[in-house]
Amino acid sequence: GTGTAVGIAGGLFHMLNHAVYKSTLFLCAGVVEKRAGTTEMDRLGGLAKLMPWTFAGTLVGALAISGIPPLNGFASKWMVYQGIIVSGKDDGTLWVIWLAAAMLGSALTLASFVKVLHATYLCKPTTAITRRNIRDAGVAMGIPIVFLAAVCIVFGVFPTALPVRFFIEPAVGTIAFS
């Protein structure tokens, strides 16, 4: 870690956010597997029209994990980036490499999820799988997806008012800095 207050807070916030957006993505993948009978992307396609709520949840989760504003992944990654910059102000130029590596990781994550979104939801169906009676998540599967996607948005739009204030600051406040 960066050892700075903002870096530690950013790391804790990112752990919380990771649990939220990764859970969203896993739930959406589960719905796709349950409804389509496969998670092989080359056998899917065109599911956005058949599963709009699942597509929306996957889209929010993918953008959040990639650090796109105004979602929660951006807010915590921004704090981590600030921690890198603050910790590097007295250490020469090594911080630039760490910052570039972190940003490159986010860009590569976005690229991978663009492929997932396109192959699963947006491209023309490659097999007869989408001609089956595929439907979106039911209420029991859909409510958690919608709730977690909403948390991704709320934690991104109001990062300091909600998660940082109530979860992160109390934890960071207990750490003694030298």
Placement of each model-derived feature along the sequence:
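Alpha-helical multi-pass transmembrane bundles of energy-transducing inner-membrane proteins
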Residues: 1-41
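Alpha-helical transmembrane segments and their helix-start/interface "positive-inside/aromatic belt" motifs
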Residues: 49-58, 135-150
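Hydrophobic alpha-helical membrane-insertion segments
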Residues: 58-69, 144-163
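Interfacial segments of multi-pass membrane proteins
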Residues: 1-3, 77-99
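Alpha-helical transmembrane segments
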Residues: 14, 36-46, 119-136
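Membrane-interfacial helical/loop segments at transmembrane boundaries in membrane proteins
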Residues: 79-87, 162-178
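Predominantly late transmembrane helices and immediately cytosolic-facing juxtamembrane segments
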Residues: 22-26, 95-133
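Hydrophobic alpha-helical transmembrane segments of multi-pass small-molecule transporters/permeases
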Residues: 11, 15, 31, 59-65, ...
